[in-house]
Amino acid sequence: MNQMNPAFVMPDVQSTPDTRQIPIQRVGVKAVRHPLTVRTQGGEVQPTVGTWNLDVHLPADQKGTHMSRFVALLEENKAPLEPATFRTMLAAMLEKLEAEAGRIEVSFPYFVNKTAPVSGVQSLLDYEVTLTGETRNGATRLFLRVRVPVTSLCPCSKKISQYGAHNQRSHVTINAELAGDVAVEELIRIAEEEASCELWGLLKRPDEKFVTERAYENPKFVEDLVRDVAQRLNADERIVAYVLEAENFESIHNHSAYAVIERDKRAG
């Protein structure tokens, strides 16, 4: 094996000038799986595994970015994830990469311990969460996305049938741009409270009876579901914009029913 000359300086190719004079809006690393901890609304720290995308703006005169520094940032970040620490992490990335603009996105499973409505038995239910932060033109924006599984029951089916109504599992996905701190649990509760019924990981027979009857007493089309959730988001001043989706995995069709509401409150 060749011995390296102590006087030899390894070239830093990515730091050399680029003559094509074309800026790159986003360059970085994608789909990096790395453990993290998340601070819950109650103050506890929950361990999970995140899938990270990190990128920065690259000026026209710079050949490449420092890819290893993105992963180094993940290794250095030990603070439980919450809006304040996420903003700090974004600022640290821009400093480390010597960039004026950048973006961090992390998706992870988030677990909530839920108590069954009648038996009181406890079980975990998982939710898909994505936190995104981006800095552009000196301004930082923060987005919280939560996908919430719920139950929906068809009002039309209930109206025309003598023996019940078709119901199905649905997904309510809220992607909110935040002006203040909003906990994951808060968005989960909004979606669950506006559905025909929420879900639990473990139910006993009395609980199943409750869930069935609760959904029957609270039928909603997919249009009702998104509008009712939208009313709650509209009333929350900490949320400045949102994209809201609802998808019903129809039990009597081989397709889904789908609805989307988008609103930017800054536009009136």
Swiss-Prot record:
GO BP terms, alphabetized: tetrahydrofolate biosynthetic process
Broad class of enzyme this protein falls into: hydrolase
GO MF annotations in UniProt: GTP cyclohydrolase I activity
Pathway(s) of this molecule: Cofactor biosynthesis; 7,8-dihydroneopterin triphosphate biosynthesis; 7,8-dihydroneopterin triphosphate from GTP: step 1/1
Keywords: Hydrolase
InterPro entries: GTP_cyclohydrolase_FolE2, GTP_cyclohydrolase_FolE2/MptA
Catalytic activity line of the entry: GTP + H2O = 7,8-dihydroneopterin 3'-triphosphate + formate + H(+)
Pfam families membership: GCHY-1
EC number from the UniProt entry: 3.5.4.16
Site feature (May be catalytically important) residues: 154
Family to which the UniProt record says this protein belongs: Belongs to the GTP cyclohydrolase IV family.
Family matches, as PANTHER family: GTP CYCLOHYDROLASE MPTA
Function recorded in the entry: Converts GTP to 7,8-dihydroneopterin triphosphate.
UniProt name for this protein: GTP cyclohydrolase FolE2
Organism: Paraburkholderia xenovorans (strain LB400)
Taxonomic path: Bacteria, Pseudomonadati, Pseudomonadota, Betaproteobacteria, Burkholderiales
